Amino acid sequence: MNSDLSINPAIHPEEMKPFRDSYWVIPGRFLAGAYPGLDNMLTTRKRLTKFLQTGIDRYYNLTGEHELVPYDEILAEEANLLQMPVIHHRFSIVDRGLPSKMLMFELLNSIDAALDNNHKVYVHCWGGIGRTGTTVGCYLVRHGMSGEQALDKLAAMYATAGQSRFHPRSPETREQMDFILNWNES
């Protein structure tokens, strides 16, 4: 499993982000944040093209199937124009809720497999705060941090995202924070 969670000072990740409501978990490789689509199809296409130009080819959507306007077909069309294979995964977690332990385990395994195979990953929910933060926190614990360290690291990474100005902490609920603090895979 890839556990390079350090930030390379030669990389300026903020300049590489495809949009402001996101943050790097592993600079240049693992991005997390808000829903990448918008109600306007043209703007969604432009935004998704920025993601693709960043090299992100694995998308982990934590929203429910009918929760937001789907973007996976537009993503596939734009990726096809760039001759870039992409995969859109859906791991549905209820808004402000918690996944089952098994779902989180499967999600983390899929993210690790993508990173181990040199893919670039984007994990998102609607706002990029609760479900996304819970996933990132558990990822950090999986890769050697304590729950407290993971929450501290998550706070520092999330502070670089645009939405942190309006919602200052990730994850969103006390239950989501406790899920990270208590995460283990035994």
Regions found by a protein language model. Give the residues of each.
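Cys-dependent protein tyrosine phosphatase-like superfamily
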Residues: 1-122, 127, 134-186
